[in-house]
């Protein structure tokens, strides 16, 4: 008599899973959806790159991209909440969590902005430092200003990579932005605030000025334009980074490698439209 083997419920479940795995297309089960958050300055760029990546590799889920500001992205990737954190300022040894790897994907210009009612032609580094540290408080003290009243100073929040980059590039290691400045949580809010206040001054990513509404001020005699930033003439340029916990691996490595691969014309076209390509 032939023996019969009765399958238990766990055996049936495992067999079913194996059957599905064997029937699935190669790589279909291996691909996970990347979760990315962090810098609001980088958000438009990373969203465009995510869309292009999914178009190039339609079997790979498009990364889920969110904002939240640089320090939030860095802390989220360190804690494992996300796969990649976007950072719009350079690594800070002793401040950033241990074990993170920063991969540069692009560069970006930071512009000083005023209200269109106060179209300053130029600001020197000394004047920028005086204004943003609070030592210069009246427009009457600023050469070329059409105003004479108090300066309304706008800043970004402390978790902002743009704030860190602005301080490093424009103010230097020792100076800090005045605590009396009004802090905004995103570039869009910063631009809107300066655009609504004729006495205002602030700073933002070059890409955030493209829709108008504010006046971009020349810095050290050089206009804040994409062309000048690419050529190296304009000094207010910072790096864009994708941050991982340890060396990039899995889907995060594939995405970052695709972005940073020399000769990737798709990426170069996207980056060069509003930012500065690194290849």
Q: What kind of region is each of these model predictions?
A:
Residues 2-14:
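Bacterial N-terminal signal peptides that target proteins for export
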Residues 12-23:
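Bacterial N-terminal signal peptides
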Residues 28-279:
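Exported/periplasmic ABC-transporter solute-binding proteins
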